[in-house]
A protein has these predicted regions:
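Alpha-helical transmembrane segments of multi-pass membrane transport proteins
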Residues: 1-156
Length: 156
C-alpha cells in the first residue's frame, strides 16, 4: 500500500510540472476587480490543486505561481497561507484522490476498515458515507470563515 502512495506522490509532482510548464497559471489575471473576487478564485484553484497534488509539490507550485498573484491583489501573506493550508486540507479530504482518507486507511488498517464498512452497509446513505460527508461538512464552512472574515477587517 505504501507503494501506491509513493506512486500517487510521484504522479502529483508530475501533474504540478505539467501545470507549471503549460502556462495554465499565466492564464489567471494578475489583477481582479475586488479582493473578495480574488480570494474566491484563488481558494477554488487551491482546493483543486489540493485534490490532485501531494502537499510538497502543491506548496512549491503555489509559492512560485499563485502567491505573487494573491499579494498583488491585496491579500495579506499570512492570511493567504492560512487560506492555502485550509484549502489544501479540504482538497486532501475530497475525491478524486482523497489523500487524507487513504493515509487514514493505511494507519487504521484494512481489517478495521472492512469491519466498519460491514457495520454500516445496511444503514442510511449518511452512515454509509459518513467518513466522506462529515469532514466536508466541517471543512467547507471553516474554509469560508478563514477566507472571508479577515478580508472584512483589512480589505480596501
Amino acid at each position: 500500500h505504501i507503494g501506491a502512495l509513493i506512486m500517487l506522490m510521484a504522479l502529483s509532482v508530475s501533474v504540478g510540472g505539467v501545470i507549471e510548464r503549460s502556462g495554465l497559471m499565466e492564464a489567471v489575471p494578475e489583477s481582479f476587480g475586488s479582493v473578495f473576487v480574488a480570494a474566491t478564485i484563488l481558494f477554488v484553484i487551491l482546493v483543486f490543486v489540493g485534490m490532485i497534488m501531494d502537499p510538497f509539490g502543491a506548496v512549491i507550485l503555489v509559492s512560485a505561481t499563485i502567491a505573487p498573484i494573491a499579494y498583488k491583489n491585496g491579500i495579506d501573506p499570512v492570511h493567504f497561507w492560512m487560506i492555502v493550508l485550509t484549502s489544501f486540507e479540504l482538497g486532501y479530504l475530497s475525491p478524486p484522490v482523497a489523500l487524507n482518507q487513504l493515509l487514514t486507511r493505511q494507519v487504521v488498517g484494512e481489517k478495521e476498515m472492512d469491519e466498519a464498512d460491514a457495520e454500516v452497509r445496511h444503514l442510511s446513505f449518511y452512515y454509509k458515507y459518513e467518513r466522506w460527508i462529515l469532514p466536508l461538512l466541517v471543512m467547507v464552512p471553516s474554509l469560508l470563515l478563514v477566507v472571508y472574515v479577515p478580508l472584512f477587517f483589512y480589505a480596501k
